[in-house]
Amino acid sequence: MIQFKDSYKHYGANGREVTALQPLNLEIRAGEVFGIIGHSGAGKSTMLRMINRLEEPSGGHLLINGQDITVLDRMGLRALRRQIGMIFQHFNLLSSYTVAGNVAFPLKLTGASDAKINARVAELLAWVGLEAHANTYPAQLSGGQKQRVGIARALATRPQILLCDEVTSALDPQTTSTVLQLLARINRELGLTIVLITHEMDVIRRICDRVAVLDTGRLVEIGLVTDVFLHPQHPTTRSFVMETEHIDTSALDQDFALVKGRIVRLTFIGTDTYLPLLGRVARETGVDYNILSGRIDRIKETPYGQLTVALSGGDPVAAQAAFAAAGIHIEELRA
């Protein structure tokens, strides 16, 4: 649906050229929730804003439904933007307009009749749970309510694509969960393609189908969230995962020094997460196991579990083979 073909962005600064986004090639599929993660300055906002040409690409091509948007004239660009909604980090609401007025604003720009605007606004406010606040002004709302107004406004013109620019970074954890649940519902029930940027891997884990990792303007990793989250390849990705998992590597090293045997990390995905595989393999191979750390959680709707265990006695090699035969991913941390 959205294709970046050698798309890049350069800026001029103090007489020299700065690369914000190096030539990028990737495709975002229709109907998916696609996450873009990176540290500040990685190029994720630039990439997101190129999709509706709030940032003009310096070169390459950017296709939406097969149409190269880099060659659109003003009228074509206006039509394109009606198909793309956008939600902002700091809400960007009009302070002098009521909640209903903010949601109605993009519809007024299309020239829709008052009757159609009023009906659509009422529908959207009910959808995001703000029908009781139609005549309230933004200053009277909480952060989560403001973001729900922003979401309703972004949906006003019935877009096909929803761009989310750090939409949870200004929210508390409980409100973040509410907003992510609303976005998941939008994707599920309305079928919108959602492109979301964040610096929080936990947001990616909870809502996205696939993720791209950017580092200083370069795409360094891309794939299904289950693959990227559980088996990160690039150092930048690994650092995001470790921050999310709250892994203290120095503490782990101390734990490793206190135990004997082969140390492995086992990753279980799906229904395997709830099976007693560790005990079964221990009985079959005669190994003793010592659990050093572990967790069970979900990546979107998919359950997963990770255990770091020390294997000793019996036949550790046979134990690893048995885990592999059961479809469990094994990472050897110490032989």
UniProtKB/Swiss-Prot annotation:
E.C. code: 7.4.2.11
Gene3D superfamilies: 3.30.70.260, P-loop containing nucleotide triphosphate hydrolases
Catalytic class of the enzyme: translocase
Top-level lineage group: Bacteria
Membrane topology, record value: Peripheral membrane protein
Protein name: Methionine import ATP-binding protein MetN
Biological role stated in the UniProt entry: Part of the ABC transporter complex MetNIQ involved in methionine import. Responsible for energy coupling to the transport system.
Gene Ontology terms for molecular function: ABC-type D-methionine transporter activity; ATP binding; ATP hydrolysis activity
Catalytic activity: L-methionine(out) + ATP + H2O = L-methionine(in) + ADP + phosphate + H(+); D-methionine(out) + ATP + H2O = D-methionine(in) + ADP + phosphate + H(+)
Pfam families registered for this protein in UniProt: ABC_tran, NIL
Subunit structure: The complex is composed of two ATP-binding proteins (MetN), two transmembrane proteins (MetI) and a solute-binding protein (MetQ).
Keywords: Amino-acid transport, ATP-binding, Cell inner membrane, Cell membrane, Membrane, Nucleotide-binding, Translocase, Transport
Subcellular location(s) per record: Cell inner membrane
Protein source organism: Xylella fastidiosa (strain Temecula1 / ATCC 700964)
Residue stretches making up the ABC transporter domain: 2-241
Family according to the record: Belongs to the ABC transporter superfamily. Methionine importer (TC 3.A.1.24) family.
Binding residues for ATP: G38, H39, S40, G41, A42, G43, K44, S45
GO cellular component: plasma membrane
PROSITE patterns in UniProt: ABC_TRANSPORTER_1, ABC_TRANSPORTER_2, METN
